[in-house]
């Protein structure tokens, strides 16, 4: 009897063990199924704040996110306050973002920078997706940055580049040392500002309205990437008091100058006066009726917000690209020599290179592409927000989730780019597929509806300035040490340290006198 009882106990225990094991296994499998549809994320999320503490420190955000990608994969998420941020950094996931889900993720979150500096989100780059953004984007792409419009303003580019060359020549043809990054800064600002409102400043000029505008824009470049508590935990926005005050002061400075320029244009129009150079502000005033109101934004606000957005995104990014390109060439003299040899063989030394010659300079184009690969104009895309539930990289992304692409990581992925940290323009000549944007391996200006509308203009300026500089001058470092290539914080990944260059004319003096 005892034996039977013990046997029954053992059988019941075994049955219970089997049932428990079955239930446990089902739960584990169910958990695995849930986890397989959940985007990976780092451990250590804090109550309320989530992963915000992981973004602290001096290390650049693009590099912090790249390190997380190495650990968690090409798509991962961070819990930031009340919101979830999805970060993508491989071609397949990026393609999902910018093709299949381009419309679903086309809007922008409502952030402090857009409210305080972007004319309450009237700026093209920060406006939410909707009727207003679509109408403004159409105006900008069709009327301001079409190939015809860019061609019509070619004389401005030529004039400003000539001014730079004459400044470098110094009139005596001797060797001189210049801070080339500062000269690029003034050059590109003048090109953009003349296109926008017909204004310019001299090299080194200070205290004018135009100079104040330029300096305020530089501060904006930095403030735009500073994390704000209120952007992820709205009811703690009061903690951003100091930063918000900075933004408001900057906006007051920018808007006062913008308003002055607008009034000057309106006054000339009322008198039927015409400037020699037709500006983008003129075009906007032609297109937009005086009484127009789109999504609560009146004409004057739309005009000023557009001028600010295009100047902010177009000036510094171009000068920074030129600075990186020259720095890379100085550290790689063989590439510099090859570029000059190509120019000499294609154009010669008897005339100045023109924009129409650039199409024949394949190595120069490769230098610009490689510069954009290593130092993209924006290392991170602007943050998007999902307008509806969608699937990205095989994972479900809920409405309201924020997304960005780490272009810096994408462009340095060793699975895509052999020896990714090395400056090698030849890679764009050896493998044509590397520069095909449709591959989503190389997207220096972003992609989709929210990509940079001024990409063609920016590329023209970079190629033309670099070609003229290399044609007209021998360039050398001031010492035998390699240039420090440390990047700083900002929208456009600026170079931290200035670049001093020894310049020496390499053409017939008569050519410089013709400019």
Swiss-Prot record:
Any matching Pfam family: p450
Q: In which tissues is it expressed?
A: Expressed in stems, flower peduncles, receptacle of developing and mature flowers and in stigma of mature opening flower buds.
| Recorded GO MF terms | (3E)-4,8-dimethyl-1,3,7-nonatriene synthase activity; 4,8,12-trimethyltrideca-1,3,7,11-tetraene synthase activity; DMNT synthase activity; heme binding; iron ion binding
A GO CC annotation recorded here is: membrane
Q: What are the subcellular locations of this protein?
A: Membrane
Q: Which UniProt keywords are present, listed alphabetically?
A: Heme, Iron, Isopeptide bond, Membrane, Metal-binding, Monooxygenase, Oxidoreductase, Plant defense, Transmembrane, Transmembrane helix, Ubl conjugation
Cofactor(s) recorded for this entry are: heme
Tell me the protein's name.
Answer: Dimethylnonatriene synthase
Cross-link (Glycyl lysine isopeptide (Lys-Gly) (interchain with G-Cter in ubiquitin)) at residue(s): 252
Instruction: Report the function annotation for this chain.
Output: Involved in the biosynthesis of homoterpenes, attractants of herbivores parasitoids and predators (e.g. predatory mites and parasitoid wasps). Catalyzes the conversion of the C20 (E,E)-geranyllinalool to C16-homoterpene 4,8,12-trimethyltrideca-1,3,7,11-tetraene (TMTT) of the C15 (E)-nerolidol to C11-homoterpene (E)-4,8-dimethyl-1,3,7-nonatriene (DMNT); these volatile compounds are produced upon insect herbivore attack and emitted from flowers and vegetative tissues during herbivore feeding. Required during resistance responses to the fungus Alternaria brassicae.
């Amino acid at each position: 009897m005892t034996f039977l009882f013990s046997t029954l106990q053992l059988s019941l225990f075994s049955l219970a063990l089997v049932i428990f094991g079955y239930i446990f296994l089902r739960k584990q499998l169910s958990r695995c199924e849930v986890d397989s549809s959940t985007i990976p994320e780092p451990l250590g999320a804090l109550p309320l704040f989530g992963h915000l503490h992981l973004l602290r420190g001096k290390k650049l955000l693009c590099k912090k996110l790249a390190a997380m990608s190495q650990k968690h994969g090409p798509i991962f998420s961070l819990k930031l306050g009340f919101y979830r941020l999805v970060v993508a950094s491989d071609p397949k996931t990026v393609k999902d973002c910018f093709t299949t889900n381009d419309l679903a993720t086309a809007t922008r979150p409502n952030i402090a920078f857009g409210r305080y500096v972007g004319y309450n989100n009237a700026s093209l780059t920060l406006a939410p997706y909707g009727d207003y953004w679509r109408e403004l984007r159409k105006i900008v792409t069709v009327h301001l940055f079409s190939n015809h419009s860019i061609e019509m303003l070619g004389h401005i580019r030529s004039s400003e580049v000539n001014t730079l060359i004459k400044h470098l020549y110094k009139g005596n043809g001797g060797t001189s040392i210049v801070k080339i990054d500062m000269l690029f800064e003034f050059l590109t600002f003048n090109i953009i500002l003349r296109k926008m409102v017909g204004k310019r400043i001299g090299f080194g000029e200070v205290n004018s309205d135009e100079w104040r505008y330029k300096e305020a824009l530089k501060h904006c470049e930095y403030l735009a990437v500073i994390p704000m508590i209120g952007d992820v935990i709205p009811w703690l926005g009061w903690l951003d008091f100091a930063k918000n005050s900075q933004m408001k002061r900057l906006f007051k400075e920018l808007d006062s100058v913008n308003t002055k320029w607008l009034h000057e244009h309106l006054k000339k129009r009322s008198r039927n006066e015409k400037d020699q150079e037709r500006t983008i502000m003129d075009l906007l005033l032609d297109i937009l009726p005086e009484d127009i109101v789109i999504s609560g934004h009146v004409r004057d606000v739309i005009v000023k917000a557009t001028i600010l957005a295009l100047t902010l995104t177009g000036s510094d990014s171009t000068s920074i690209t030129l600075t990186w390109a020259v720095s890379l060439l100085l550290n790689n003299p063989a590439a510099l020599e090859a570029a000059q040899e190509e120019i000499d063989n294609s154009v010669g030394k008897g005339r100045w290179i023109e924009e129409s010659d650039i199409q024949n300079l394949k190595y120069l184009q490769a230098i610009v592409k490689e510069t954009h690969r290593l130092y993209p104009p924006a290392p991170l895309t602007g943050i998007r927000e999902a307008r509806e539930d969608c699937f990205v990289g095989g994972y479900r992304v809920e409405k309201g989730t924020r997304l960005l692409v780490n272009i810096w990581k994408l462009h340095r992925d060793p699975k895509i780019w052999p020896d990714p940290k090395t400056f090698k323009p030849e890679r764009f000549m050896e493998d044509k597929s590397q520069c095909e944007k449709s591959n989503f391996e190389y997207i220096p200006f972003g992609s989709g509806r929210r990509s940079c509308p001024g990409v063609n203009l920016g590329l023209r300026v970079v190629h033309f300035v670099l070609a003229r500089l290399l044609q007209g001058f021998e360039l050398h470092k001031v010492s035998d040490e390699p240039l420090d290539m440390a990047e700083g914080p900002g929208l456009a990944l600026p170079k931290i340290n200035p670049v001093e260059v020894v310049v020496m004319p390499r053409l017939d003096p008569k050519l410089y006198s013709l400019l």
